[in-house]
Structure formats: C-alpha cells, structure tokens
C-alpha cells in the first residue's frame, strides 16, 4: 500500500547529539529567553521615544500587555543594567548602550520580517512572528537570511516600523 507524505508516522529520534552539544543548544535558548524581555522593552522604549517623544511606564505596560507593577520592576532592572535612565515626571530614556541594543533589535526584526514576507507569509503574521524569532536566531543565521534576500533579488524593504 502506497502512503503519501502526510500519512507517514512521526519519525522517532534514533540518535541524540553529544551531551555537551545538546546542553549548549538548550543553554543558548535559555539565554535568549532571558534577554528577550529586555530586548522587547528597549525596542518599545525606543519606538515610543521616536514617535511620541516620551516612554511612560503606563504606556509601556499597556503596549506590552503587562501590569504597571511589572513594567516598573522591569524598567528598574533595565536601569540597573545600564540600558535605561529615568527622570522624575519625564518617563524612561535609553542610555547609549540601550539605544544601540534597540537599533540592533530593530535591524534583526526587519530582516526576519523581510524573509518571512519573501516566503509569502502575510505581513501582519510576519510582524507578529518576528517578535519571537528575532530573539532566537544567531548572527550566522541572520547573515544567511540577508544573503538569501540579496541573492534572490528580493532585497530588504525600507524600514516600516
């Protein structure tokens, strides 16, 4: 009896990678998860500053879908890490280090969105998916994405954030 590809059962893993290799892979993912929170905050703060001139904790909390207390706690951590500063009654601002991180994240985000759109993922879906993917891909993978877009003639779209 002939089976098409959909009917094939899940193929079980028959060989595991070396322990150290697997541990490094999982470690990289855990590290990216912890960094993703700061990256999202820094990216949003930069966007708010660029569009409205201020980044208030209330606005940050609403846009990230977290409580005001959670936003305040995370902003305090950003300040301790040297990524942000605050001024009484003026909101949150990024340090040079925070601004550089925001720019790196914006570049990563645009590249992931461009690749997904080139693969015919609807733009709205690509934007949402890029919010997760951008934190987990390596620089080598991002370079491969850029190379693919350039060599395929699809190019990179101008920033539309």
Where are these regions (language model features)?
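Short glycine/proline-centered loop/turn elements that form peptide/ligand docking sites
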Residues: 34-38, 54, 70, 77, ...
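C-terminal regulatory/oligomerization modules of transcriptional regulators
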Residues: 1-18, 131-161
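Residues within the alpha-helical elements of helix-turn-helix
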Residues: 63, 101, 118
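Arg/Lys-rich, alpha-helical DNA-contact motif
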Residues: 18, 105-140
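Canonical helix-turn-helix DNA-binding module
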Residues: 55-92, 96
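N-terminal helix-turn-helix DNA-binding core of bacterial DNA-binding proteins
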Residues: 24-66
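Basic, amphipathic "hinge/linker" alpha-helix immediately C-terminal to the N-terminal HTH DNA-binding motif
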Residues: 90-109
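N-terminal positioning helix adjacent to the helix-turn-helix/winged-helix DNA-binding module
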Residues: 37-40, 56, 97, 108, ...
């Amino acid at each position: 009896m002939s089976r098409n590809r959909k009917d094939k059962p899940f193929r079980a893993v028959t060989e595991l990678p070396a322990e150290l290799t697997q541990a490094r892979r999982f470690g990289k993912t855990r590290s990216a998860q912890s960094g993703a929170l700061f990256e999202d905050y820094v990216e949003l703060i930069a966007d708010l500053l660029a569009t409205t001139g201020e980044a208030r904790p209330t606005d940050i909390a609403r846009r990230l879908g977290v409580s005001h207390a959670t936003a305040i706690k995370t902003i305090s951590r950003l300040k301790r890490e040297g990524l942000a500063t605050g001024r009484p009654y003026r909101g949150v601002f990024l340090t040079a280090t925070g601004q550089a991180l925001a720019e790196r994240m914006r570049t990563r985000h645009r590249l992931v969105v461009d690749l997904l759109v080139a693969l015919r993922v609807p733009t709205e879906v690509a934007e949402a998916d890029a919010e997760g993917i951008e934190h987990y891909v390596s620089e080598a993978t991002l370079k491969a994405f850029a190379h693919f877009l350039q060599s395929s003639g699809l190019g990179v779209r101008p920033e539309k954030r």
